Amino acid sequence: MPTSRNDDMMVFCSFCGKNQDEVQKIIAGNNAFICNECVELAQEIIREELAEEVLADLSEVPKPQELLNILNHYVIGQDRAKRALAVAVYNHYKRINYHDSREEEDVELQKSNILMIGPTGSGKTFLAQTLARSLNVPFAIADATALTEAGYVGEDVENILLKLLQAADFNIERAERGIIYVDEIDKIAKKGENVSITRDVSGEGVQQALLKIIEGTVASVPPQGGRKHPQQEMIQVDTKNILFIVGGAFDGIEEIVKQRLGEKIIGFGQNNRAIDEDSSYMQEIISEDVQKFGIIPELIGRLPVFAALEQLTVDDLVRILKEPRNALIKQYQALLSYDDVKLEFDEDALQEIANKAIERKTGARGLRSIIEETMMDVMFEVPSQENVKLVRITKEAVDGTDKPILETA
C-alpha cells in the first residue's frame, strides 16, 4: 500500500546511512536496516576472504614424497602410477601458487593434466579420490559415456563443472582449484572412417568439447543443470586452474604398443612375450599409441602426464582386503563389532575372494560384492542371536560349499 514520504517515515541503512530514496531496496532486521548496495559489498568482501582462505590452504601443498606416503596408506600396489600422480599434483598446485605471485614478465607455467590408463578395478578412480581428499579440495567424477555434443540428448560437458561446484558448495573460488576425474574416456574414442553414416555425437565431438574446458576457458555453467531451464542465469567458472584427471581401461591398446615395438603376435612364435606379461606393455604406452586408439591429438596434448596402472594380482587383492586404513575386512569387522561379535577370515578365504575377483575381471572393485554374497546370511541372522560371539569365514564359505562357522559364548 503506497505511503507518503516524510522525515518521520524515512528509513536509513544502518551501515552506509543512505535513505530508501537513494537505493533500490532496504531490508529491515532486528532494530537495524541494510540496503542492497551494502549487501552486495558484504558479499564481495566475503568472496575475497574465502578466496584468500583457498589460496592459504593451497600455499603449503604436500611434497611428492608426502603425497606418496598418503596414497600408500589407502592404495596397494601401483607404485609407478602413484609416484607419477604425486609429482603431477604437486607441480599443478605449485604452478597455481607461482601464478598467483608472479610478476608480469615471469615465465608462464602451463597446466599438466593427467591421463590414467589401466584395467577395470585397478584403482584409477580411488587414486583420484584419495588425492583430492588429502589436499582438501573439491572433487567431482564424470562418466565420459554420458556426455554428448551440444544439441543432442545427453549431458553437456558443462555439467561436469556443475558437479564440481556442488562439491564446493557453490564456492566458485574453491571449485576453480578443484580436481575433476573423467572416467571411461576410452569409450568415446574416435570411430574409424566410414564406420557409420550417423553422426558421432558421443565420440570425437565430445572429445572436442572436453578439450575446451580441459585446456582452460571461462565456461558458463547452468546452476540447475543444463537444457531443461534455458532462461537460468549462468555461473562463470574459469577452468585454467582445475586439475583434470582422465582415465580409461583402453582395452586392446597393448596390441597397438606391440605393433609399434615390432612384437606383433602371430600364432605362438617363440619370440612372443607370454600372455600374462601383457601388462608390462602398459608402461611402454606413448601418445602415439593413445592417438591410434582413437583419442584426438589435441586432447592428448592437454594430457601430458601418463600414469599406467597394472592388472592387480591375487596377492595385491589380498593386501587390499587387509592392509589399507579403510580395508574391507576392517569395515566388516567394525560392522559386526556393533553387535558384540568378532569377525575372522581364514587366509585361504581371502585368497579365494581374490581369485573370484580375478575370474570375474572386476579387480578391487568386485571385492565388496563377493564379501557381501559370502556374509549375507551371517549379517541377517547374527544380530538376532545374542549367544554368537565369533564368526569365522572359511574358504568353503566363500566358494559356497559350506557356511561360515559361528562360535557361541
From Swiss-Prot:
Alphabetical list of Gene3D superfamilies matching this protein: 1.10.8.60, ClpX chaperone, C4-type zinc finger domain (6.20.220.10), P-loop containing nucleotide triphosphate hydrolases (3.40.50.300)
Binding site residues for ATP: P119, T120, G121, S122, G123, K124, T125, F126
Ligand binding (Zn(2+)): C13, C16, C35, C38
Segment forming the signal sequence: none
SUPFAM superfamilies xref list: Glucocorticoid receptor-like (DNA-binding domain), P-loop containing nucleoside triphosphate hydrolases
Example of a GO MF term: ATP hydrolysis activity
Keywords of this entry: ATP-binding, Chaperone, Metal-binding, Nucleotide-binding, Zinc
Domain of life: Bacteria
DNA damage listed as a keyword: no
Keyword flag Cell wall biogenesis/degradation: no
Subunit structure as annotated in this protein's UniProt entry: Component of the ClpX-ClpP complex. Forms a hexameric ring that, in the presence of ATP, binds to fourteen ClpP subunits assembled into a disk-like structure with a central cavity, resembling the structure of eukaryotic proteasomes.
Family that this chain belongs to: Belongs to the ClpX chaperone family.
Function of the molecule: ATP-dependent specificity component of the Clp protease. It directs the protease to specific substrates. Can perform chaperone functions in the absence of ClpP.
Name recorded for this polypeptide: ATP-dependent Clp protease ATP-binding subunit ClpX
Organism this protein belongs to: Streptococcus sanguinis (strain SK36)
